[in-house]
C-alpha cells in the first residue's frame, strides 16, 4: 500500500520538454510561495483503505472487539480503555462503533502501523475516542464521524495525565492530521486534532462544545469535567501549521487554532481560509481564538470568523494573536448581534499597521469589521525588539455603535483619517500601555500626523486617550454657555478633557459675543483641548477693551492645546492678544491660525498671530494671520517668555515697537523656526525678532519679503535661499520627520499638516528607433488631487536620452504643494526599449528583410560567414546556405553589414553558440543587439514555459 508521501503529480518540465513526476508538495513554475506554509503530506494512503481495524489488543481497562461483515464493534466496560492496534483504517463501506459505558468514558487507541490511519467510512462513539498514530491520520472525503468527544493526534498522550483535568500529548511523529470528511461531536462535546501539521478541509461540528486544532510537538488539553476548555501548545518544531480551509461550527462553544509555543523562536503559522462559526446559542456566547507564537509565529486571517448573535443574546469574542497577524482584504470578521450587544475582536501582534497595501490590515477590512464588532488592535515590541508602534495609515470609517481601541506599548500614530458616525460610536487610544505581558516603553505617545483628522459626529460618541475620557465637542454653543458639552460651554469646566469631533462653523460669533475660554489668571483653562485635526472656522472675538483675548484667554501650566486649526479668525483686544490664546503657560502643538489679529488700543502689548504672551511651549505650529498691534507684536507670538520650536509665520506684521516677523519681543528660546511676512514698525523692528533678550537658534527670515535686512536674532536669507533645503539642513532641521520643502517652490512646510500623495510614473515600452528618448507616459495619483497640487509634471532618470535596447528609470518630478496640501511621494516607472524585431528561422519561411531606409529592422537575422567576423554583400544579397550560419560562434560580438537597402535571408538556421551579443549594423547605425538565446525551437512547447 503506497503512502501519501509517495503520491505524485505530473508537471511540465521546461528543461526536458516533457511531463515529469514530482512530489505532491512540489511547486510548479509560477509565483513564489507566500509566507503561508503548504500543508505537509500525511503519510497515509491516497487510495481506498483496504481493511478495518486489525490486531487490537487491550493494554489497560476492559473491553472486547467483534466484527460482523463490514462493521467492527469495540465494547468498552471500564471508564478508561487503552488499546494497541496493528492497523486502524476504515474503508468507505465500513463502520466502526465504540459502545461505551457513559459519555465520560475514554477509549485510547494507539496505532502501530507503518503508515498513517485512514478513516474513509463511519466511526461512531457515545463517549470519547482518542486515535493516536505518529504517521498521520486522514479523515477522507465521505468520512462520517459521530462521537461524544474525539482526539486525533500524531502525539502520544501521557498515561498519568489521562484521568486528570490537564492531559499532555507529546511525540516526534512526522505525519499530519487532515480532515476532509465530517466530524460531529455531541452537544457539549469536543474535537481536537493535534500534530506538527494539522488541517481541516472538511466539516467539524461541536455545538456548545469545543473544536481545537493544535500544531506542535507538545500540547496540553485542559478539561472541566468532560468539557474541553483550553488548548495550549507547549513545544514547537520548525514550520508548525494549523490550517482551516473548511467549515468549523461550535455555536455556543469554543474554537481554538494554535501553532507553535508562545515563546518559541521557530516559525509557525495559523492559516484560516475557510469558515469558523462560534455563534451565540441559547445565550451562550462563542469564542474563536487563532493563536501563533508571540516570538516568531504568524496568523493569517482570511475566510470567515463569525462569533455573532443572529438569534438573540450578545455577540461573542474573537482573538487573533501572534508575532505577526495579517488580515486578508476579503476576510469577514463579525461578532454582531441583532438584539443585543456586539462582541469584540482582539488583534494582538507586534508593530501593527493599518494600510491600503503593504500593511497588516487594510482600512476597508477594518471598517467592514467595525460595522458589527468592537475591534481592539494591540501592538507590542516583542522579543525581536520592534518599535511597539501601532500605525493607522489608511482611512477607517464606520457607522455602527461600535468602538475601535488602539493600544500600543509605544506610539499610536494616526496618519490617516478616522471617521465614526454612529450615535454612540467610540474610539479608545492607549499609547505607552503595557500589553501582551510587556511593559510600556515609557516614552510612547499619541501622534496625529499627515493632515489626518478624527471625526466622531454622533449624538453621544465616546473618546478616551491615554486613560482619560474626553467630552466630544460638535457644536459652537450659545453665548455665555457653561454646559461643558459645546465649545463656548467649556467655560463650565475649565479642567476637563475636550476634543473636537468635527469641524465647527463659528460664523454665528459675528453677531453674538464669544467669551474666551478661561478668561483670566483667576479662571484659567487647565484641561486638555484635543482638536483631532479639525478646524474652527470664521470665529470672531471682539473684546476691544479687554486683555487676555483669544479662543483661550488664559492657559495654565497644565493646559494642553493640540491638533487644531483656526480658519478665518477675527480677533480684537487691547493686550495679551492672540487668535488661539491670549496668554499661555501650557503646551500648544500642531496648531495654526489664518485671519486677522488686531490689537486695537495704542498701548496694546503682546499681540501675536497665534499667541499673545507665551510663557509655555509652542511646537510644530504656524500662523498666516495678519497682525497689528503696538508694543511687542509678532507674526506668531507677541511676547515669548517660553519656548518656540519648529514653527513659522507668514502673515504681515505691523506695530509700534518690538515688532518681528515671528516674535515681537523674545525673552525665552526660539529654535528651528522662520518668518517670511512683511514687517513694519516705528521702532525696534526685525525680520524675525524685534527685541531679543533670550536665545535664537537655527532660525531664519526672508530678507526680501519681510523688507527687513536686520533682526535682533536669526539669520537672514534671500527668497531663493528660503526655498532651498541646503541651508536648513546645515542648521540641523529635521526633514525626515518634521519638515519638508519643495526646492525652488516653497519655504519649509510642516509635515504634520500635509496629506501624503503617491504620484507614480506610468511605464513606457517603445521599439528601438535609434533616437534618444525624452518625456514620459503620464502619472497616476493615489488620491484625487485638487487645486492644492501645483506645478507641472516633469521626468528625469536614466530614461532621458536612452537609445539602445534595455530598461531605464523614469523619475517623475515638478509637482509641489502648499502647507495644507500634499506631501508628494514619487514612485518611478520603467522605460523599456525593445530591440528591433529579429526573425530567427528554424524552418523554411518567407524571406526576411533588413530595411535600412527607416533605420529599423522589420525582420532579420544575424549571420557571419565562415572564416570571417563580418559580411558585406553586393546588391540584393540572398543567403540560402544554412551551413554558413552555423559559424555564428565566438567569444565576442559578431556583426552583419548589409550593403544595400534590402538583404533577404531564406531557409536560414541559426546556431546559438558563443557568448557575446550579436549586432546588426546598417550604414554605421547600430540597429539592434540580439541575444544568442533568441533562437526558436522547431516544435511547440507549453505556454507556461518561458520562450528560449
Which functions belong to the PLM regions below?
Residues 11-12, 131:
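Hydrophobic beta-strand positions
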Residues 780-785:
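Extracellular acidic, Ser/Thr/Pro-rich low-complexity tracts
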Residues 5, 18-23, 27-470, 481-493, ...:
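Extracellular and secretory-pathway beta-repeat/beta-biased strand scaffolds
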Residues 351-767, 772, 821-827, 832-848, ...:
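Surface-exposed repetitive/solenoidal architectures
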Residues 772-779, 810-811:
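A short beta-strand segment in extracellular, disulfide-stabilized domains
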